[in-house]
Amino acid sequence: MLGLIGASQADRVEMAMTYSDSDGLIRRRSGWMIPLGVFLVTFVLSALLLIYYLAPSAPNFLEEQVSPTSRTDLVALRVHGLKLWIPANYLQYASSRRGGAFKDVAMFALLPDLSGWSDDDAPSFSGNTADSPVVYLLIREERLNLTEADRLARIYMAHVADNKGTAGPFGLTQYAFRDDTGYRNEDLFVGQTPTGPQLLRCVRFSPRVPSPSCLRDTPIAHDVALSYRFKRAHLAEWRQIGQAIGRLVARFKEEPRENALQGEQRRR
């Protein structure tokens, strides 16, 4: 009996020692596992941040890529109720060539005759030299659809260094935007035409911008505006470019004969 009691006590002592040893081992492991876990999490997060900021960014595949075509069939489009019939080779994106209603329609054309994209002219359309002949056009919805005269008086005059301007090149009046405005590093050129002033914002030449562009923004319908840009090297042709684009947009607004449009649709 005493032997059994002794054995039982010995077992309890052994068990106590075992649990005590295990508990100490768990405590010892806990002491270095928690800092190790914190270190590993911090290391992984730091590595991910470095990869995010330093790795080259991949193209955003959610944004549609320009995909020109040499097709010339007419595409029926609408921008805020304005109906347009535009040859497919003027449209930059395949989605717009499906036709229908859009908030904006992006196009391009080639100076001097504002021709659409073609296989032969593909190198010219893809270039970005200082004298590139490409003109980019955008017809879009515009709630604040100011005339160019209103835009000059209500927006730009508050941001120029001298409201009087100076005599600029090519029959234009030139204004310099102040450095404390969002238009810094740009010049404003105003030309007078029979239909009112024509405004062109042109980025200045600089080592960082060796091939700057000029931008014009003008209303073409109720709540619909047209903007187009061309290289500043072609500023001497501002009047001819404006007239040619006016004729081009008027052509886009012309509704084709029904049988002609049906014939174009059959050829797609």
What annotation goes with each model-predicted range?
Residues 209-268:
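Long, compositionally biased interface segments
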Residues 1-33:
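N-terminal Lys/Arg-rich, disordered targeting/topogenic segments
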Residues 80-131:
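Extracytoplasmic/periplasmic/luminal assembly and interaction segments
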Residues 90, 204-206, 230-232:
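A mature extracytoplasmic/lumenal domain signature
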Residues 123-209:
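Non-cytosolic head/periplasmic domains of membrane-anchored proteins
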Residues 54-74:
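Ser/Thr/Pro/Gly-rich low-complexity linker/stalk segments immediately outside membranes or between
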Residues 35-56:
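Hydrophobic membrane-insertion alpha-helices, especially the h-region
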Residues 74-82, 210-214:
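Short aromatic-glycine motifs in intrinsically disordered, low-complexity regions
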